[in-house]
Amino acid sequence: MRTLTIEPLTKEAFAPFGDVIETEGSDYFMINNGSTRRYHKLATVETAAPEDQAIISIFAAEALEMPLVIRMLERHPLGSQAFIPLLGHPFLVVVAPLGDAPVPGHVRAFRSNGRQGVNYHRGVWHHPVLTIEKRDEFLVVDRSGSGNNCDEYFFTEDQQLLLDPQQVSR
C-alpha cells in the first residue's frame, strides 16, 4: 500500500485542484474609510446551471482514526466546494486530478496551516473533510440545485492508499 507524503499547502502546488484561500501573499485594497483590508476574490464559486445557488453551510467534523486507509474519493461535477477552517486548526486535504476516475498514482495530500482554506474546482476528486483535531468546524461554500452533485469512487483493495500525518515532506 502506497503511503501518501503530505505536502505543505501552497497556491502553486494546489493550483491543479483548486484555490488556496488565504490572506498571506494575497493582494488587497482598503475599504471602510481605511480601517479594513479587503482580500478580494480569493476563490471563485462555480455552479453548472443558471438556476443553481451558491450556499454557505457549517460542517462540524470529527477526526478519523489515523493513519487512515484512503478507500474512496468524491467529486462534485456541478459546482465547486470550499472549506474554510473556523477554529484555526490545521487539517488535511487529499486530492486527485480531473478525470473519469481518480488514478491512485496521481493522488496527493496537503496540510493546511489552519489559516488556509481550500476551494475544490468543479469535478476535482477529493476525500471528504479530514480534520486532525478531535472536533473541528468549517465554513463551506458550495452549490445547491437539482441533479446529482456527488460522485463517489471506491478504490479496489490493491489501489488503496495510506494517509499518515507523520509522513510530511520536508
UniProtKB/Swiss-Prot annotation:
Taxonomy, superkingdom: Bacteria
Uppermost EC category: lyase
One term of GO molecular function: ureidoglycolate hydrolase activity
Keyword Lyase attached: yes
One BP annotation, GO: allantoin catabolic process
Any one Pfam family match given in the protein's UniProt record, by short name: Ureidogly_lyase
Enzyme Commission number(s) of this protein: 4.3.2.3
Recorded catalytic activity of this chain's protein: (S)-ureidoglycolate = urea + glyoxylate
Keywords assigned: Lyase, Purine metabolism
Cofactor: Ni(2+)
Signal peptide location: none
Keyword Cytoplasm: no
Gene3D superfamilies reported for this sequence: Ureidoglycolate hydrolase (2.60.120.480)
Pathway: Nitrogen metabolism; (S)-allantoin degradation
Subunit structure: Homodimer.
PANTHER family linked to this entry: UREIDOGLYCOLATE HYDROLASE (PTHR21221), UREIDOGLYCOLATE LYASE (PTHR21221:SF1)
UniProt record similarity statement: Belongs to the ureidoglycolate lyase family.
Function: Catalyzes the catabolism of the allantoin degradation intermediate (S)-ureidoglycolate, generating urea and glyoxylate. Involved in the utilization of allantoin as nitrogen source.
Official protein name in the record: Ureidoglycolate lyase
UniProt source species: Stutzerimonas stutzeri (strain A1501)
